[in-house]
């Protein structure tokens, strides 16, 4: 069996690294999107409540009373931050997918060269 050229091994390592990064980005993006859905649902429910409704938020092991407006503002701020995270991760996802495509093309070229060299060696004997 032929030895794998260092250039091909390097490309394969870079490809695997980029794939792992993409998986990490996708996981974080999914987590933020799930939290964003929860925040949207909470905002929707709180907006239905009367102005003087008692609202409590969890702080560690305690429930602390909060005004409706303060709760809404806190949730809207959180929503804005989550949307920013999702947008940033979507950009990273796009860049990583492009990087993976380029690395895949490079890997295929290197493999084609390697196969071509092996075919020439077999045919030339």
UniProtKB/Swiss-Prot annotation:
Q: What is this protein called?
A: Prefoldin subunit beta
Name the UniProt key words of this record, in alphabetical order.
Answer: Chaperone, Cytoplasm
What is the similarity comment for this entry?
Belongs to the prefoldin subunit beta family.
Q: Which superkingdom?
A: Archaea
Tell me what organism the protein belongs to.
Answer: Pyrobaculum calidifontis (strain DSM 21063 / JCM 11548 / VA1)
Asked if the keyword Ubl conjugation belongs to this entry, the reply reads no
Among the entry's GO cellular component annotations, what is one?
A: prefoldin complex
| Molecular functions (GO terms) | protein-folding chaperone binding; unfolded protein binding
Q: Which CDD domains match?
A: Prefoldin_beta_GimC
């Amino acid at each position: 069996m032929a030895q794998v050229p260092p250039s091909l091994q390097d490309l394969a390592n870079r490809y695997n690294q980029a794939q792992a990064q993409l998986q990490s980005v996708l996981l974080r993006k999914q987590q933020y999107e799930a939290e964003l859905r929860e925040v949207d649902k909470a905002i929707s429910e709180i907006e239905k409540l009367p102005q003087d409704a008692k609202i409590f938020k969890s702080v560690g092991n305690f429930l602390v009373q909060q005004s409706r407006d303060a709760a809404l503002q806190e949730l809207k701020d959180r929503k804005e931050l989550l949307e920013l995270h999702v947008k940033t991760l979507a950009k990273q996802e796009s860049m990583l997918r492009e990087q993976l495509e380029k690395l895949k093309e490079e890997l295929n070229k290197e493999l084609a060269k390697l196969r071509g060299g092996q075919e020439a060696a077999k045919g030339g004997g």
